[in-house]
Amino acid sequence: MNELIIATRKSKLAQVQTEIIMGKLKSKFNIDSKKLLIVTEGDRKLDVSLNKIGGKGLFVKDIELALLNKEAHAAVHSMKDVPFEVSSEFEITAITGREDIRDVFISNGDISFKDIKKGAKVGTSSIRRAAQLKLLRSDLEIVPIRGNVQTRLKKMEEQNLDGIVLAAAGLKRLGDENLITDYFDPKEFLPAVSQGALGIECLKDGDANKYFEALIDAEATLTVEAERSFMKELQGDCHSLIGAYSEIQGDDLYMIGIYDIGGKIVKKDILGCKTNNIELGKKLAQKILG
């Protein structure tokens, strides 16, 4: 095979993430690859909140179509955007590693989160982030904003917000770590399921899958699979009020989860053998559901 074609979203972050995978392929196999840029439904409908336009697969379906049409050998996704069940034609061939999983606060004026004024306006499009912000500071006014990192930063200025909440992973991959004012403790302010992880999706039995399988990160796979199992048991998606944190502790996996039940955020944790990661995620969900 002379060249691999990798489908991805058009955003700057999606392209940077795909270039990370392209670099790994080049160093491991000395094989060239190129990007196929796709505008997804989630990218087209920026004026509507994600939970109103339907959660599952908004950033994935259009890219999967390129795989079905054999226009690309693989797709690179942020795993937090991937529904817990992928269509039978596809597989998540590799989870390639996780960047910093934490959420961060970017201040419009270099004021730390704990010091922002009473009634401060904080921008986020995530109901998970909004709910956890309210738990920390019930006085905050949550302002829904959507778009890529650059768009949200621009909206923070235009709408005179006191700050916004974003994922550390995206900022670090873009080289914008210097914008971060505060990091939230991921055990207290739980990230999205699979936050910070990159996944490679292929058609089952695709002729190029072997290249992507070589990029699997075992530890990241264990934690992401556990978190996705947790989400699946709750029948949630990336726009539900679900958060998860997991870490490998020697031979064990420790996991914390949150879920909204009747307007109340329920938080539980679990510890068990890491080889039972999928079952652990399921049990944590059952523990939360009571």
From Swiss-Prot:
KW DNA damage (keyword) present: no
Enzyme Commission number(s): 2.5.1.61
BP GO terms, sorted: protoporphyrinogen IX biosynthetic process
Pathway: Porphyrin-containing compound metabolism; protoporphyrin-IX biosynthesis; coproporphyrinogen-III from 5-aminolevulinate: step 2/4
UniProt keyword Translocase present: no
Residue(s) carrying S-(dipyrrolylmethanemethyl)cysteine: 238
Stored SUPFAM superfamilies: Periplasmic binding protein-like II, Porphobilinogen deaminase (hydroxymethylbilane synthase), C-terminal domain
Segments crossing the lipid bilayer: none
Entry's Gene Ontology cellular component terms: cytoplasm
Cofactor note: Binds 1 dipyrromethane group covalently.
The entry's keywords: Porphyrin biosynthesis, Transferase
Listed cofactors: dipyrromethane
Disulphide-bridged cysteine pairs: none
Catalytic activity, as annotated: 4 porphobilinogen + H2O = hydroxymethylbilane + 4 NH4(+)
Single GO MF descriptor: hydroxymethylbilane synthase activity
Residues in the signal sequence: none
Known function: Tetrapolymerization of the monopyrrole PBG into the hydroxymethylbilane pre-uroporphyrinogen in several discrete steps.
Quaternary structure annotation from Swiss-Prot or TrEMBL: Monomer.
Family: Belongs to the HMBS family.
Other facts: The porphobilinogen subunits are added to the dipyrromethane group.
HAMAP family for this protein: Porphobil_deam
Name of the molecule in the record: Porphobilinogen deaminase
Protein source organism: Clostridium botulinum (strain Eklund 17B / Type B)
Gene name of the encoded protein: hemC
